Curated annotation (Swiss-Prot):
It comes from Actinobacillus pleuropneumoniae serotype 5b (strain L20). GO terms for cellular component: plasma membrane. NCBIfam families: oadG_fam (TIGR01195), PRK02919.1 (NF002792). This is Probable oxaloacetate decarboxylase gamma chain. Its main location: membrane. It is an enzyme of class 7 (translocase). The lineage of its organism: Bacteria, Pseudomonadati, Pseudomonadota, Gammaproteobacteria, Pasteurellales. The gene is oadG.
Length: 85
């Protein structure tokens, strides 16, 4: 066999192999989609029950009045340490 014949056979083999792989991947995609459809048909995911929203209370929950003296004391302590006042 000459180099040209070997090169031609190599190209032929490469194209045949790539075509076979492409065909196999296409069949695999359709098989996976079909199996997914079957699984979803016979084993559907349960629908979650709606969660009741909590009723907002009349008293605000973010009342931080009890933290104001603590924050003021922390600021005063920091300023004393830094020599600012």
């Amino acid at each position: 066999m000459t180099n040209a014949e070997l090169f031609g056979e190599g190209i032929n083999l490469m194209i045949s192999g790539m075509g076979f792989v492409l065909l196999f991947l296409i069949v695999l995609i359709y098989a996976i989609s079909f199996i997914s459809t079957l699984i979803n048909k016979y084993f559907p995911e349960p629908i979650p029950a709606p969660v009741a929203k909590p009723v907002p209370s009349a008293v605000p929950t973010d009342n931080l009045d009890h933290l104001r003296p603590v924050i003021a004391a922390a600021i005063a302590h920091h300023r004393r340490q830094q020599g600012l006042k």
